[in-house]
Regions:
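Short alpha-helical DNA-recognition segment
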Residues: 32-56
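Flexible coil/turn residues that form the inter-helical turn or adjacent wing/linker of helix-turn-helix
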Residues: 20, 31, 47, 62-65
Length: 86
């Protein structure tokens, strides 16, 4: 059996599980929107991300799916590309 140390680490093994958490938080706060409001607006798009998950996305302890990112970008009225700009 090959030891795990011979494999490349998976992204979920790191402390930072997403690249966009800081940007989501900044954009949400700039719009004076609560985490619950963001969650509620995503739900109207049939994208179910609870308030606690929004918190974990923002502190980078939860991954984000492509559909979730799409919804977040629509609710925050910003292009998806902007989440990856420095």
């Amino acid at each position: 059996m090959i030891e795990r140390s011979y494999f490349m680490p998976r992204i979920i093994d790191s402390n930072d599980k997403n690249l966009i958490g800081d940007k989501v938080k900044a954009l949400r706060k700039a719009k004076k929107m609560s985490q619950q409001t963001l969650s509620d607006r995503l739900e109207t798009m049939a994208i179910y991300v609870c308030r606690g998950s929004i918190s974990r996305i923002e502190d980078k302890s939860r991954t984000v799916t492509d559909i979730e990112l799409y919804g977040i970008s629509k609710v925050l009225e910003t292009p998806i590309e902007s989440f990856f700009e420095s």
